[in-house]
């Protein structure tokens, strides 16, 4: 090894060690000036000898060249969100659900930690070196932010020690400490630049900079809170012990994290953090409680979007008084008329709030609110602003009643309210400009047709200029036409056309979701596609056939039937197909028609030890069974595993056949 290479190795090792002491252990052993001198020497040597550059060099923290866009990263293990509890009763219900499922939870410890208000990220270490970082995104797919994350000094580019797995995914929160946020905004104010609203927005904006040099200048921090992929090694079977392992490898862990042994201690931890919240160095909006035993976590499993073994116990929403100046009525994609309160701006829950939803006419009546009232505004869960009450003693003499419109405020069509529904709707359909805009925004959204470059502002201009009326009109646009729009040059216009052409190759679930059928989300669209296999079959299905689809009840089935019964909707579909929208054909898995389960409606409940729930479902469907998520009088068989709960009780009450896991295995042979 040459003298230069040896010196580079020494410098990197020394800077790594001092970085851990400073950012992880909070116990620096050299002055900042000495650290800076070593870093300058490293930068100079690497600049003079680029052939000796290393992917884990501390110098990478200063940032690289700007990116054109972020690449997508598919998470090998989904990054799910957490369910919330807002009071002790909901926390106790969470605990009871777990103990009803698995009694051993009663004897488990719980790992408790503050719920940081930042941005969730995934860090992938291969042979101890940070090779990729990604945002959480939608939980399934995030964005590659490796270059930006390398600039965060608290995140090690190389793990310490030698006992870590060969592939280790560390998950945690990138956030901006309060002091760093205040200093950042002070600099922005001095320069006459726009200030950030809160530390979370500042952290998110900093992390998603295409130029990592900008990120490097931002005071970002990181705390690890879990792991994802583990290959080529093993971790402790305790969540808390895994934290200690991560800390030993150089990853920072929230110092407030605590292991407790009872629900009472969980509540005490929550109250302690709540009382000290304002004195912490970072913003939090609650605490996270996790079952500590990893094996119990695995047995408890997950629901669709969250683990059963963890919950976020949110702090009480912060409330403030403000004036209700006016009420505007907005029209949504499905024609829903929503009253929006226009408020005297007030700072609450970390943001300035000037609007709040009043939901519907029933809510206005319940509150007894009038324009001119002083109202109590709350950010429910510290997220959604809402009016919770009226201060009647402050009502002025000139307060005005809120009159719900009988005609659409946009197109003047009649406003209708279906009996039994709280929502009033414009009857104008796509002749209503507001519905048209929202329908088109939905159509091009990421989970739908995923057309890049067609943002809300562009859609609004296209509708206002009467350039598009239906989704099919989008595919008739030409680049030359788009250049008349604001901020749309020839290159941007061509990019939009290219994106539209690319979007023509889609999937049946995405196409169904893009149509904007009431209460048909992306998961329901996927179930419909997998059940019927073709658009034609869906268009011709009856109410009874729709109800056979997993998670489709009478209400959703009625919406589907009504949608496909309308000639104008069929015309929109035909026009889209004429524009060249296609998708790969779907084929059904082979079904054993002579199976004893063929045509039977089956429900799985409880946890199974010999196969996963998904494997059992797939095997049953291959035998011709229809697997649904709830027990009803139409259910033929229930297979009950360990800790089966309410579904088993209902099946017994209805006299439905119930079999255990061993019987399920026999059926599948």
From Swiss-Prot:
One of its GO terms (molecular function) is DNA ligase (NAD+) activity. GO terms for biological process: DNA repair; DNA replication. The keyword Protein biosynthesis does not apply. It catalyses: NAD(+) + (deoxyribonucleotide)n-3'-hydroxyl + 5'-phospho-(deoxyribonucleotide)m = (deoxyribonucleotide)n+m + AMP + beta-nicotinamide D-nucleotide. Zn(2+) binds at residues 408, 411, 426, 432. Residues 592-669 form the BRCT domain. Keywords: DNA damage, DNA repair, DNA replication, Ligase, Magnesium, Manganese, Metal-binding, NAD, Zinc. NAD(+) binds at residues 32-36, 81-82, 113, 136, 173, 290, 314. Its cofactor is Mg(2+); Mn(2+). Its EC number is 6.5.1.2. SMART domains: BRCT (SM00292), HhH1 (SM00278), LIGANc (SM00532). The active site is at 115 (n6-amp-lysine intermediate). It is an enzyme of class 6 (ligase). InterPro entries: BRCT_dom (IPR001357), BRCT_dom_sf (IPR036420), DisA/LigA_HHH (IPR041663), DNA_ligase (IPR001679), DNA_ligase_AS (IPR018239), DNA_ligase_CS (IPR033136), DNAligase_adenylation (IPR013839), DNAligase_N (IPR013840). It holds the Pfam family HHH_5. DNA ligase that catalyzes the formation of phosphodiester linkages between 5'-phosphoryl and 3'-hydroxyl groups in double-stranded DNA using NAD as a coenzyme and as the energy source for the reaction. It is essential for DNA replication and repair of damaged DNA. Belongs to the NAD-dependent DNA ligase family. LigA subfamily. PANTHER family: CHROMOSOME TRANSMISSION FIDELITY FACTOR 18, DNA LIGASE. This is DNA ligase. It comes from Vibrio cholerae serotype O1 (strain ATCC 39541 / Classical Ogawa 395 / O395). The gene is ligA.
């Amino acid at each position: 090894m040459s003298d230069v290479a040896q010196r580079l190795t020494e410098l990197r090792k020394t800077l790594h060690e001092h970085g851990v002491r400073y950012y992880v252990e909070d116990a620096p052993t050299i002055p900042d000036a000495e650290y800076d001198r070593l870093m300058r020497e490293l930068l100079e040597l690497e600049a003079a000898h680029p052939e000796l550059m290393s992917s884990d060099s501390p110098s990478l923290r200063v940032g690289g060249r700007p990116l054109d866009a972020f690449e997508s990263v598919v998470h090998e293990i989904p990054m799910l969100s957490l369910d919330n509890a807002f009071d002790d009763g909901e926390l106790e219900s969470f605990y009871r659900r777990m103990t009803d499922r698995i009694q051993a939870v009663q004897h488990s410890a719980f790992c408790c930690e503050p719920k940081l208000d930042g941005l969730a990220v995934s860090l992938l270490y291969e042979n101890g070196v940070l090779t990729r970082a990604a945002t959480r995104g939608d939980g399934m797919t995030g964005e590659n932010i490796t270059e930006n994350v390398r600039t965060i000094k608290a995140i090690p580019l190389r793990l310490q020690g030698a006992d870590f797995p060969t592939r280790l995914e560390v998950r945690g929160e990138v956030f901006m400490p309060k002091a760093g946020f205040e200093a950042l905004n002070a600099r922005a104010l001095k320069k006459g630049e726009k200030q950030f609203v809160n530390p979370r927005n500042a952290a998110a904006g900093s992390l998603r900079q295409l130029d990592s040099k900008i990120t490097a200048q931002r005071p970002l921090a990181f705390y690890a809170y879990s792991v994802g992929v583990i290959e080529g090694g093993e971790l402790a079977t305790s969540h808390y012990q895994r934290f200690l392992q991560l800390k030993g490898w150089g990853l920072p862990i929230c110092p407030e994290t605590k292991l407790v042994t009872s629900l009472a201690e969980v509540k005490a931890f929550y109250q302690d953090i709540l009382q000290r919240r304002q004195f912490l160095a970072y913003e939090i909006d609650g605490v996270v409680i996790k079952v500590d035993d990893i094996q119990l976590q695995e047995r408890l499993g997950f629901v669709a979007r969250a683990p059963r073994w963890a919950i976020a116990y949110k702090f009480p929403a912060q409330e403030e008084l403000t004036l209700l100046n006016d009420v505007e009525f907005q029209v949504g994609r499905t024609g829903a008329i929503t009253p929006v309160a226009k408020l005297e701006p007030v700072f609450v829950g970390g943001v300035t709030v000037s609007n709040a939803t009043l939901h519907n006419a029933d809510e206005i009546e319940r509150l007894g609110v009038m324009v001119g009232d002083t109202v109590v505004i709350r950010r429910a869960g510290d997220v959604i602003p809402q009016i919770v009450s009226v201060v009647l003693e402050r009502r002025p003499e000139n307060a005005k009643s809120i009159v719900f419109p009988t005609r659409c405020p946009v197109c003047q069509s009649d406003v209708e309210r279906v009996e039994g529904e709280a929502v009033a709707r414009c009857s104008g359909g796509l002749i209503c400009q507001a519905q048209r805009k929202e329908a088109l925004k939905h159509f091009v959204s990421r989970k739908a047709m995923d057309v890049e470059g067609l943002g809300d502002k562009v859609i609004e201009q296209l509708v206002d200029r009467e350039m598009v009326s239906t989704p099919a009109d989008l595919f008739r646009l030409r680049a030359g036409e788009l250049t008349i729009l604001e901020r749309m040059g020839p290159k941007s216009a061509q990019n939009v056309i290219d994106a539209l052409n690319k979007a023509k190759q889609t999937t049946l679930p995405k196409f169904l979701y893009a149509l904007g059928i009431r209460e048909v989300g992306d998961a329901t669209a996927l179930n419909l596609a997998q059940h019927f296999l073709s658009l034609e079959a869906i268009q011709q299905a009856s109410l009874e056939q729709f109800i056979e689809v997993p998670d489709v009840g009478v209400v959703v089935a009625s919406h589907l039937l009504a949608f496909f019964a309308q000639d104008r909707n069929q015309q929109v579909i035909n026009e889209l197909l004429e524009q060249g929208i296609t998708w790969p054909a779907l084929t059904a898995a082979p079904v054993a028609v002579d199976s004893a389960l063929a045509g039977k409606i089956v429900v799985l409940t409880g946890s199974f030890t010999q196969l996963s729930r998904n494997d059992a479902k797939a095997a049953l469907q291959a035998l011709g069974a229809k697997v649904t998520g709830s027990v009803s009088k139409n259910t033929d068989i229930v297979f009950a595993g360990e800790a089966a709960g309410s579904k088993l009780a209902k099946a017994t009450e209805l006299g439905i056949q119930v079999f255990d896991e061993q019987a399920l295995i026999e059926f599948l042979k």
